[in-house]
Structure formats: C-alpha cells, structure tokens
Swiss-Prot record:
UniProt-listed GO biological process terms: defense response to virus; mRNA catabolic process; nuclear-transcribed mRNA catabolic process; nuclear-transcribed mRNA catabolic process, 3'-5' exonucleolytic nonsense-mediated decay; nuclear-transcribed mRNA catabolic process, non-stop decay
Keyword Cytoplasm: yes
Region (Disordered): 339-397
PANTHER family in the record: SUPERKILLER 3 PROTEIN-RELATED, SUPERKILLER COMPLEX PROTEIN 3
UniProt name for this protein: Superkiller protein 3
Amino acid sequence: MSDIKQLLKEAKQELTNRDYEETIEISEKVLKLDPDNYFAHIFLGKALSSLPASNNVSSNRNLERATNHYVSAAKLVPDNLLAWKGLFLLFRTTEVVPDILSYDEYFDLCGQYADALLKQEQSQVELINDIKLLKKTHPDCQKAFYQHLKPGSLMAETIGRHLSTPQDALLNLIKILSNIETTEIGKTLSQNRLKLKASDPDYQIKLNSFSWEIIKNSEIDQLYNQLVNILADDQKRSEIENQWLEYRIKVLKSMPLDVKKDFFTKVKEMVEDMVLVNHQSLLAWQKYFEWTDYEDLDNMDAPLIIKYFKKFPKDPLAMILYSWLSSKLSKYDIKSLESANKPPEGHKKTEKETDIKDVDETNEDEVKDRVEDEVKDRVEDEVKDQDEEAKEDEEEDLDDIEIGLLEEEVVTVLTENIVKCKNNILAHRILCQYYLLTKEYEAALPYIKNGISLIAYNIKDLGVHLPLTKREFSLDLATVYTYVDAPKDHNAALKLYDNILSGDFSNIQAKMGKGIIFIERKNWKDAMTLLTQVHEQSPNNLEVLSELSWSKAHMGYMDEALAGLDTVIKGIKGMDLRSIDFRALNLWRQAKVYIMKHASINDAKQENVKCAFKLLIQSIKILDTFAPGFSTLGDIYCHYYKDHLRAFKCYFKAFDLDAGDYTAAKYITETYASKPNWQAASSIASRLIKGEKAKAELRSNNWPFRVVGIAHLEKQEESDSIEWFQSALRVDPNDVESWVGLGQAYHACGRIEASIKVFDKAIQLRPSHTFAQYFKAISLCDVGEYLESLDILEKVCQEAATEESFQIGLVEVLMRCSLDLYSQGFLLKSVSIAKDTIERIKIIISELKCENQQVWIYLSQVLRLFIWIESKVDTLPVESLVSIFENSQFSGSEEIDSVDNIKIDTLLDSTTDDNVSIACKFLILASKYSVSDQKFTDIAGTVRASYWYNIGISELTAFITLKEPQYRDAAIFAFKKSIQLQSNTSETWIGLGIATMDINFRVSQHCFIKATALEPKATNTWFNLAMLGLKKKDTEFAQQVLNKLQSLAPQDSSPWLGMALILEEQGDIIGSSKLFAHSFILSNGRSKAAQFMYAKNVLENHINNGDDERDIETVEKLTTASIALEQFFKKSPDSQFALQCALLTLERLHHYENANELANRLIGILEKKFEKTQDERELFNFAIIKGQFARIHLGLGNFELSIENADLSQGIISESSDEKSMKTKISNHICLGLSYFFLNDFDQTLNQFQELLSISKDSKHLVVLIAKVLYDVGESDTKEIALQELTEYIATSGADLLVTLTIAAMSILDDKREDLSIILEELKALPLSKQIIDKHKDAPYLIEEITKRLYRNDTGKQVWQRSAYFFPNNLKVWERLDKNIQRRIASNGQNKVTAEEMSKLYCESKNLRSIQRGMFLCPWNVTAVKALNECF
C-alpha cells in the first residue's frame, strides 16, 4: 500500500513537472498494482490529454485513452467531482464529442455529473452552459439531446428544467424521429418499388412491409402517449392527440395482417374515447362513424350526429349524415332531434363551458347560414303562399324550415359532398341507401361498387372489420342487379343472395330479394313458394307479406291476396315517408288485384273496378307523388270509363312523377302524335329513354326512339334523327316505320344511295308499304332514275288514288324528268312528259280538289317548258288547262291584273292570240293561282315575296318571248313588290335588273350589283351584268366581269359566249370564232344562244369565202351549224334570221329537201308580217327569200318553179340598186339561165347570161359557170365562145388558177395538142403559192393527163413525186404514189377524212383486221361489206 502511495506521489510530481510520459508510466504501474485506483486514472487522463501527438501515436488515441480513464475514475467514485471536472474540462477544450464520444454517451455523462453536483450541492451553471454551447455548435445532437430530456431520464430529472420543458422535449423528439422515419421509408420505397409489379394484387402490402421494417421498432407511439399524459393545455393536447391518431393510422397501414387486428382495436378504442370526450379532431369523428358497423342506417346515434354536424358544419361527411337525418326517407325526426339538442334557457355554465358554448353557437350560426343560403328561395316562396291573417303560423313554419333540410336540398348535399368523401365507406352507404329508396338503381350502382372496393381496401390496409356494412353493400348490389338491365344480371344477383345466405341462412332480406327476382321474372309460382317460407320464418314482416300477397294475386288467389294486403295496410303504423309510400303501394296493389279480379270474372256492373277506383283515390290522397296510382287511375278512365281527357291528365301526372312509367308515356305519346304534336311527343319519349326504369321495356319496344327521330325530322334536324332511327332498329330490326324514317333522314342529308337501300329494306319487309315505295321513288328521282321512279309512283297512285301527297310526288317527278330531258336535248320527249304532267295536275285539282302551292309551281315549270320549245307549243293541252283554272278558286290579284290584264275570262274570250301567247298567259295565271286557297294578307311576308317573285318571273318570260311591253311593266311591278317584302333574295334583284335593262341602264346596273353583293358566286348575275355593259358598248367593263365569271365557273358556256361577243364587237374575227365554237362545245350543243351564235359565225366565215365544196372541214362546220339550227328551231321555230341562216347552210350542203321546207315556212312568216304591217321592208325581205327559194328549186330540179320564183323576186327588186339587191339579181339571173338551159331553151339561157355579164364581168366564178354552160352545149362555136370568155378574163384580170384549170380541162376533152403543150408548160410553171391554194391537187392531175396524151408514157408521175416533196401530208398525192402511206397518213389524224373514205382505205389493204375496222367506221360501205365476205 505504501508503494502505491509513493508511486502516486511520484506521478503527481511528474505531472506537476509536465513530464507526461513519466506520469503515464508511473500511473500504469499503480493500476497494475491496483486496477481501481481513482487517482491513477485521473493522472492518466490528465497526462494523456496533455501529451502532444507523436509519430507513433495520434492525438485522438491519447484523447480516447484519457477519456476512458476519466470515465473509469468517475464510475469508481461518482461523488468525487475531481474526475468529473477533469473530464468535462477535456470535453470543453477538445473535440472529443462527437469524434470519440457519441452524443448519447456525452449526455449520459452529463446526467451523472449533474447528479454528482446536485449531491455535492455544487453549481450546475457551467455544465448547463457547456450543454447549451454543444447544442448550438452541433445541430446534429438534437435527437440525442431530446432523448435524454424525456421524462424519467437522469439528465431530465437533474437539469432538464434548465434546458427544456418535458412537453417541448417530447414534441421536438417526436418531430425529429418522424422526419427520420419518413426519410428512411421514402428511401426504402424508392429503392424497392421498381422491383415489384404494379399489377400484383399484393403490391401495396409488399410496399407496406418495407415500411414496417422501419416502423416496427419506432418509439414514436410511446412518445405520443407520454406527451399526451403530461400536457395540461387542453387545446394543445387535442392537437397532439389528433397527430397521434394520424400516426397510428399510418402505422396501421404498414402493419402485417397478423398484427393489424389487435392494433386496430387499440386505434378504434382511441377514436371512441376521443369522440366520447367531444374531441376537436375531425379525423377522430370521421373514423368513428366510418368504423362503426351499423346494422341499419336508421339506428345510428342521431344526437351524436347532430353534435358532429354542429361541431364541423363544413365537413362533407357531417353534411351527408345530417342530410340523411333530414331526409324524409329516413326514420329520424330531425325537428325533435334539433329541439332536444338545444340547451335549456337560464342554465348557468362555468367559464370553460361558456367558451365551448360560444364555439358551438358560432358553428351553429355557420350551419344556419349555410342552410339558409340553400333554402332561401324556397323559404320566400313558402312565406308568400301563406295567408296574411295567419301570421303566427307563418313564423312557426319558417322556424320549421330552418330546422333540417328540404328533400331537394338533401339530394343536392348528398351528390355534392360524396365527391369530397371518395374514400369514406359510410358516405357511400348512405348515398346508396338513398338512391335505392328513391328507386334510382342505376345511379346507385357506381357508388355501391366503390363502397365494396373501399371495404376491401380498409380490410387490407387497416384491418377494419365491418361485416354488417359489407353485407348491406352486397344486398344493395343484388338489389340493383335485380332492376338494372334486367334480366341480364339476375343470375349475378341470385349468386350474391346465395353467398349471403350461406353465411346467414336466416337473412330475411336475402330471401326476400330472391323472391323479388322471381317476381321481376314473372315467375310467380317460385316467388310465392319462396316468400311463403320467408313469411313463416318472419310472420310480422309486412314487406314479405306484401310481396307474397302480390304473388298470390298473379297466381289467381285473389281473395287471399286481398286479405294479405289488407293485413299489411292495417299493420303499417309509421308516418314517415317510407311508411306512407309503403301504404300507398299496398293500396295500389289492392286496386290492381280488384282490376285483375274484374277481368277474370267479367263483372258487368264493374263493382271491382269501383273498389279499385276508390282505393286508388285513397292511395293518391295518402301520397300525392305516388305515380303508379295515377297511372292505374288513367287505365280505369281509359279502358272502363272511356273518359280520355281525364285519362290523359292521370297519365300525364303519373309520367311527371315517374319518367319510367311505360304505359303512361305510351298513351301520352300516342295522344300527342295523333294531333300531331311531334315536339311534345318527342319530349315524353326522350324522358322515357333517359329514365332507367323503362330500360327493360325499351329492349323490346322501339317506338320511343322512333318518335324522337320523327320529331327531329319535323324540325328539319335530319342528321340528329339518324342515330335515333338506328337505335330503334337495333331494338327491332323489322320495324318498317323506323326504316322509312331512317331513309327519309338519309335522303334529307344528301345520302341518296343509302336512302334507296334503306327503302328497299323497308319494302322487302312490307311490300305493300306505299310510303316506303313513294320515298324510294323520290330518291330514285334525285339520282336521275326517272323511269324507275315513275313506274313506282304510277303503281302507288293506282293503289292510293286519293292520296294527295302521292299524286303531287308523281307530278314533281314528271316535271323534273321533263326538265332533265330538256337539259339533255331530248326536247320532244320532254314536251310529251310535260303534257302528262298537266293531265296529272288536272286530276289533282279537278278531282282531288287539292290546291297545294307546289302544284301550281310545278304547273308553271311545265308551261315554261312549252314556251321554251315553241315548236311544240301547238300540242299544249289547252282544254285541260282551262279545266284546271276553272276548277280553282281565285280571289284575284287586282294590283297585277291592272297592269297585264291577264285573267282566265279574258284568255278564253280572246280570239287573236297565237299558241305561244296563250302559253305565256297560262304561265302567268299559274303563278297568280299559287296562293288562291287562302287569304293573301294572312300569309307570311317571305311567302308573299316568293309569290310576287314567281309572278315577276312569269311576266318576264312572257315579255322575252312575246316582246310586248305590258308584260315587262308587270314584271317590274311584281319584282318591286317582292323586294319590298324581302330584299335579301338575289334572284329577285336579277329579275328586276333584266326587266329594266331596256328602260333604265342605271337601275338595271344597281340591281345586278345588289344581286352580286347578296350572292357573289351566282354566275347568272355576273353574266347579266356583263351583257348590260356590252349592250352599252362598254367592252372593257364587260370583259372584266366575264373574266371574274370564268374564274367562278370555267365549265359554264355563258362567259365564253360573252367573250366571243366582245371579241366580235372589237373586230377580232378569228378569236371570236374560236370562242363561239368553244362555247358551243361546252354547252354540248344545248344552249339556245350558243347554237344560234355558232351557226351565224360559221356562215359568216364560210359564205363568200371561196371555199371548195370538197373541203371536209368546211362541210363539217356547216353540218354542225345545221344540227345546231335544227335544235334551235325546236325551241324557236319562227325565228326569221335563224331560218335564213338555215337556208344558207342547207343550200351549201345540198340538202335541198330540208331547205325547201324551211323556205316555205319562212315565206309564210314573211307573208303574214307583210299582210299585217304592209311594210316595204318586209316585201323586200320576201323578194330576197324568193331568190333563195329559186336556187333551192334549181337544186331540186324544179326548173319551172325556179324560174317562177326568180321572176317574182326579180320583179320586186328590179328597181333596187343596193348591194344586197345586186347579189339577189345575179342569183336570179343564174337560176333563170340554168333553168332555161336545163329546159333546153338556149335563147333565154343566152339572154340571161348576157344580162349576167352586163351586171358583173369581174367574177371568175360567173365566167367559169358561163363557160361551162356554153361548152356543155356541144357546138363548136359555143365551145369557142366559152374558151374565148375564159381567155378574155385572163387577159383582163390576169392569170387565175381556176380559169387555167378550166381551160386545161376543156383542151384535154377536145384533145387540142397544140394548146396542150402550152398549157402543160403553164401548169408546170405554177408558183408555189398557187400550188398551196390547189388543196385537191387538180393541177398535178391535169399535168399527168396531158403528159399521157402528149408523150404516151408515165413521166407524169414525177409531178406527183414533186408534190409529195412539197406536201408530204396530202392524201391526194400519196393516192397516186403509195396506198399504204396514204392509209397511214389518214389513220394518224394528220388530215381530215370522211368515215367512208377511211373505210375504203382500210378495205384496200385486203387485211381482215383492217376490213373489220372499215366496217366499224362505215357500216353502209358496200365495198367494205363485199371485202369482208371475201375473207370467209
């Protein structure tokens, strides 16, 4: 022992001398002798902490050893402060904490040091300051710091009050641990989430297991428990308890299933305790109600709900619960509940209770404000309806309204707040119960499914055990399956009931549900059997007895059913809405049983019906919103009392209350449709379709869809009607009426082909359906199938001869067919059909007495057709038209009659009118008669405007046709009237512009400009404006307008025709000719103006132009002009100028027979005009035509008639000396000379030729003609004279190709060799310009012939070779050289060849294929036929 003391003295001395190494060595020797030596540990701690760092040992190692020795010394003698002071001096001067010593170890030592200081009654200030400094400089020590300040720890008990309150310490520790826990859970989940499949059913459970690994060792729950127990502030404790509950629910979700159940019990007990003490935690209240497994929603703790609602009036769950209490469908009396919940007056409360009351009153005020806002309008309405004298009752009613909610507001609150309670089971259960009680099964379905999912989620996540709620949702789902989409889901409903019964065999609701399914299936026997068993099991259940009695009634046990229902009615005691509804239902069932009983016994006195009637009245008095009562009452009025007005009212009331009442809806719809009021019928049908209760009926009855479709057709909303008709056909594909309606909709939407197919389907289903055939015919007409359409309509009209619509439809198709034929150029056929149309109209007006406006419009169209085709106006059925107008009532149109004076009486009295004039007057009358069946002033303004427009068009047509000014004035008057009534119609402005074109240029221009503003793309407006400009010689303006028109309608012939007229006016003959031809081609030769202008232009280009008759191109153009004029004459047969053009054309084409007919017609027209006017100009024109007629007779070989006409013409114009007269005189002399020549009167022939030469010696054609005639006489002297005339012409006028060729031909015929040599040289020396003129190569031919006669060889072939060099594409040249090349050139289209010539060329190849081509080109070619025969 003395050695130890000595060593300690030495160590102390060395320590004083700061020889730390020696101190360490001595102290270690002491510890070897005495391991628990207090001072040795202190000396070692001091020395080691003071020892500087060396190469072998680090300073941290020394500090660690020093710390351990200080701690060891403190543990050996805790009450000795020396070691503690050295240790904490070390802590203060070095970074031992936290580098060597952890925070937990440090704070443990702090607690022990504080305890030693306390025992020694020493100051703790320095220690406290050290702790605070450490906390400040080392923020990461917070967790350990607060861990050691938990109540019960040594540090907390000694110096905790100086550092923090226990409440703050626990609260801060909870926050720190919660943050750490949340961070670790998030990190773990992010690491493992991707390792799991989201589709895995246990995905969430597996994720929770990762969280549980972190949470299971957590002390947060215990800390919350400690904190709650020590909190004195109620509000603070309430907040902490709410946080604790949230944490516990979080822990509950992460727990494994095996431990979740026990912990859920703890959490649930905590929630119940919190609610018991009226806790401020909203979550606790929500979970309390959600986790309470109510057997019946009518047995909830209503006062507690009121309390909950007043505490949290804005909470969605509270509002839903309160609305359920307020609903008339629940068993609660909200008024009594509210009254019982009010505190008694004068009750004294403590200060704390007063504060709570203030809060409750504030909440109550919020509730009232909320309720008052929702029912404000209804309160005002109720107050207004009260009697002013009952002021006290009014105030009481107002108070009643303020308590609870109205039923409409209940629905609003439920539907609005369920969105905010998506995860609350009880909220879904309440809403589902409400929907089921109101029989809105389809609306309940999604909430039932959500509720079942929420239960499964709560069981899996929280371990919630709600067997009763789960059973109720299963029953609700089965109930919905019973009624929604029945009977599709009946099997699913039965399985649900069986599952419930497997766990609870005595469940009355499940058994009753199965019975109701049997009732819905009309399986009354099984229903009665099952419900009998249920009734025996529960004899006091009135619902079971009611359903059983209803089943017995349908099985024929009427008396038993009535007795059972009477028992049910007597057993109903409650006065809530459900009880009242149940009483009304059973009274209705009794009434139905009486009606069934009446039907089974056929009671003539209708006693049972009277009983049923009384019961129904009673049920309606009990519950005026019971729809089946009104519906059945309607049945009685309709079928038994025959009072259809009251039946309609009852049905309407029933349907107003229940949009799913199929019987009421059908009766109301049929009533509206019979009026017809399709819009009202559609509204009823639409409501029936939208309602879910009638879906079972709508699976087999499609009339509601058809009614809605028809209503859309009536509103001209055809595209919307299509889907309704399609829906109707999905229900019943054999419904003909729906097919017809669908076809009409397709037709109106422009889908004509589809409509035809649909009508075919309807006809296939019912061939006798006349309307389907009628509509098909109309559709066929729209696609241009007029013949098939007419065949169908003829049959339909025969089957239903008195149906006006069919007859009018036939007239329409006939009219459209005739117009279509007219547009295609089939004018005569068009007129024929127009006549049939008039006869049909006669039947409609005379026999059917129908004066539909459309009929008069159709009559106007066909009459206009006769005016357009004047050649057939004599076939106009005047007698039928007279009959039509005489059988029509016409009040007269004095305004227009005073202008045109057209009436049926004046028309019949007139004897001077021609056929065209009569047709025009009938056209005007047809326009006037179009509104003769009603008072004109009562018609809508737009209709009157169209009436005046139709009259204006008819008057304008008459003016254009007859050129009589009174019709123009009448047209202007009518158009102005139409514009006054409706000024936004471009057609009226166009008509007025045309009518005023000859009167006032500015007015006409204004009208056309107005029309273009209203309808900028209307081509006829621009064309008329251009013609107006051209009429005023403003070609530049007209050209600009036509350019605009060409951009709008380049395929239209009108702008091209206008451009041609402009170019003609400007003198561009070539350009105008091309455009006239282009316009004629674009119109397909059907435009009247294009026909006439093209023919005129062709004649201007080819008359007096020296064209050879052998030119195919000229003949082609003249032939086309002839055809154009032929079509023109069908429309305007008496056009004088057109007839003259046609005579010229036919004369050039040598069609003398046709020309003769036209000449006779033209002469007759001129004679009539001359007789009527006695105008010398008409006589002059007559003479000109007579001269032309003489040429036609000359062509026909009628020489004497030719002489007669020529003499007559010559006599009339003998004194005239103008150019036209001189041409006619020359023509007359030629006709006379040639006629006398062919009549062998040579003297007269010579006289006429001498006269001819005296008039004109400059015409080479006249000289050649005379020479040919003289040469043809055959006398040598006449031949000499002929040659002499030709040579004289050459001497005076110079060399001419025609004259030279004529001399050559005469010389060849006379075989004058001395002259032939000279002529040959002249022909060979012809310049190239003359050879170009010689298109038919007459010169090479004559050279060849002369060569043969002079040299007797084929050297003349060289001239053809030379011509081939200059003219390689000339067929005549290659005809002499090579037939194959000639055929190839002809077939390549390089030359115009007639079909017969081409056919001959093909036949000459002696090839079968070529011969067949020749036959195809020209079947009348005899040569081709012979060649083809030779091939076989």
